[in-house]
Amino acid sequence: MGSHTIQSKGAIALIVVAAALAMFMSALDGTIVNIALPTISSDFGLTTSTVSWVSTIYLLVSAGSLFLMGKLINVAGYKKIFILGFLLFTIGSFACGFLPVILGSFPLLLVSRVFQALGGSIMIVIAPAIISNYLPDEKQAKGLAIVMMLASLATALGPTIGGLVTEYLNWSWIFFINVPVGIFAIILGFIVFPKKTDEKKTTMKGFDGVGAGLIFVGLAALLFLFSEGSSLGWTSLPIILSIVLTIAGIGGFIIREHRARDPVLDLRFFRNPSFVIIVVINALLFGIFAGANYLLPFYLQLIQGLSTFNAGLILTALSIGLMIAGFIAGQVYMKLIGKLKYLLMGGTLLVAAGFFLLSRLHPWSGLGIVAAGLVLIGLGLGFTTVPITTMILKSAPPEKAGMASSISGLMRFAPMTIGIAVFNVILIAGVKYLAGVNGIVSKPPADIAANILTSGFDLCFFIGLILAAVVFILCFFVSEKRLAMVKETVSE
């Protein structure tokens, strides 16, 4: 149990609401903005590459600060950091919608996004951590299921909500809608946490600020590398520099943390093979999920001719599958302790089946095939995400719950960015190759282009199928007994 376990049903419900709000809003803001970028670009007279920094800077700051936020949770306590996270997020959201419009300054939008990203980073880390810390063991899987389901729903609905808000109001309201939710969450934070919430487990004395700086630079450079590599060119100076910074930042961080008295990340977590396997499984699953979620709107709009709104409706099939399976996984988790790897295997097989269907798409394929593939992937993710997240959090002692939550958050956040970039590279390379060797000349050019592009999509989804097979094999090596030993290792 966590160090402040609560038993009251009402208090448990409020804790779950607080965690769900944090995860939902942080996930929603990761996808709601992208669809408004063309409008923002037009309003400020910006190029596509310049306006993309609205999304890029949020990504870099959020990912780079995850481990720092995990450390702050352990130092200051859940209540203070929860309120701080929503305060930064709410102020940043209001500033994003207000200051750039009033003052006509695009740089102010980027500065405001930094504040919003810092708040979002706290929310990503603290949501699963408060579930692990406050809920009884038998309630944790159910609580995490609700939190993760809402996060997935927010990710899927973000573009649709963003499109509707931009079309019928204006892009500023994409940020303004966060404000009342943020105020409500701050009020909730003052009343929901037990009085002893802020009992300190660690202090900032001896805090490894250099390590925090190194991992921030390393992770930010890594995500910049993958998010901008295709557009800037893999041999361009910014990308080469980001490779150098990635190696220097992450390499320097690992060396530093081995020597630090009070490390930002306890590397002893990764001495346990089962912990490493669980983290890799989590990363691979979220990577291929993000890749599919990124590519399918292009297939639905360019090949099937759907509108943005209708394409978004098809994509909600994934969220439906995830919510159903997540609910079931939360209910059966406690009954399957000792046999959880079989739940992971079953979920992975469903993910693989979904990617198999998507890898067989044609320009004339029915939308039912796409929806079925998405439902299967969603079901598979639901059956794997809840037990994986729960196992990661349970592997940490209470004083390092924030650290474990940071690892869990990073292994969702970073692989999604990398997965999108990798699938994009595969698509471009596949289309170029197919266009070069395809000798079909009897069909209209538009039909040939559609066939080639669809074949590129199929190649990406086939790679997703292969990676799902790799995950299935890794599941055989998951040992819950060995995973339970992590807590003893990092507590020494």
What are these regions (language model features)?
Residues 26, 55-58, 62, 116-117, ...:
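Structural signature of transmembrane alpha-helices in multi-pass secondary transporters
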Residues 4-12, 102, 204, 232, ...:
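Helix-boundary and loop/linker segments of multi-pass membrane transporters
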Residues 5-6, 186-216, 258-273, 334-335, ...:
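Flexible interhelical linker loops that connect adjacent transmembrane helices
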Residues 180-198, 216-228, 245-259, 471-479:
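C-terminal membrane-cytosol helix-exit motif in multi-pass small-molecule transporters
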Residues 40-41, 72-73, 96, 161-169, ...:
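Interfacial helix-cap and linker-helix signal at transmembrane-aqueous boundaries
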Residues 1-11, 198-203, 445-448, 478-492:
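Intrinsic disorder in cytosolic terminal tails and internal cytosolic loops
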Residues 14-21, 28, 33-35, 48, ...:
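12-transmembrane solute porter fold
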Residues 2-192:
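Transmembrane-helix bundle of Major Facilitator Superfamily
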